[in-house]
Amino acid sequence: MVIVDDSFAWLITWTTYGSRLPGDERSYVSNTFVPGEGYIRKQNTPGTPYTADHAPSRERARELQRWDTVQLDPEEAFLVAQSLVAAASKRGWRIARAAIMADHVHAVVLDCPIDGPAVRRVLKGNAYAVLRDHWGKSKHCWTTGGSDRQKRGEEAILTAIQYVADQEYKLAEIIDMQAVRCAAK
């Protein structure tokens, strides 16, 4: 794959509904709940470390959860991968690498608009439509929002691609616009 050093990509991440709540011990990019004070705005700028393991945020999120928690199975993850490839291909975008796990999705997207949140909305919306058709009904499957981290230059883009490639527990992935099923571990 050829990457021009003045190019950019988006490392886009979103989660399945209820599976990775604010306050999660693994890490999270969400507002942090401080009892008696309200919320501290999420930190989602390049170079900002992730926040992790905050019990008050986790407990508050569980209280506010309105639908069942969603965990993708291998077939659903592969459908998501195929939908991301189709959405990107239709728009002339490239997904260099994506990883679909039971509880979240990472995608490195190139040749796309500078508006990361818009790119994420397109990908999530297309994946939702495919899952809705698969389930035969509407079901709240994604958390609102997500993370859009812009990567500029070859080194940053290749680092993001490697980060996504190294994800554990992948059910499906995309390797240079090819959806692939992952072997069960």
Predicted features by range, described:
Residues M1-K185:
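Short catalytic/metal-binding and nucleic-acid-binding patches
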